[in-house]
């Protein structure tokens, strides 16, 4: 059963979800978290940046960051992340923010994903909010927990 999304307004670049699992670092793998998102069946596994203090099964707010290998404008399709379970490899969504200094765009793909443009031929200034784009994601997408303000929980 899908749980309804919270309705409290927060920074649109922040992802709001539920912590499903926490995995410690190993010799060949950094620490990771698995998150679920309201109104979706996504279970996204991301590299944890910093200390993730939420309890498993509880709500969590933070920033999902990924490196976009190339960003293409698309005219059809919707918002999605592939695969539904695991580490993201492909993201399609509408642009909700662009940071020309950091060369990032934030996509609404069921949850916000901040994508750093890594193709040297592409700059964030070339993209506009509202455009529908699709990109391949380099391995190693991350999640950084943000402590919510009292009205963001």
Write out the residue ranges for each language-model feature.
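A structural detector for beta-sheet-dominated domains
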Residues: 36-38, 65, 96, 108, ...
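Structural preference for solvent-exposed beta-strand-turn elements
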Residues: 2-19, 109-111, 117-128, 137-138, ...
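Short, solvent-exposed interaction modules
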Residues: 70-127, 131
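Acidic (E/D-rich), amphipathic helical modules within compact regulatory domains
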Residues: 23, 28-79, 84-85
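Structural detector for short beta-strands of small beta-barrel domains
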Residues: 2-27, 82-103, 134-135
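Short, Lys/Arg- and Gly-enriched loop/turn segments at beta-strand edges
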Residues: 67-77, 138-150
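Short nucleic-acid-contacting surface segments enriched for D/E, G, S/T with interspersed K/R
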Residues: 49-63, 120-136
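Short, surface-exposed beta-strand/loop "edge" segments at domain boundaries and coil↔beta transitions
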Residues: 41-45, 112-116, 143-144
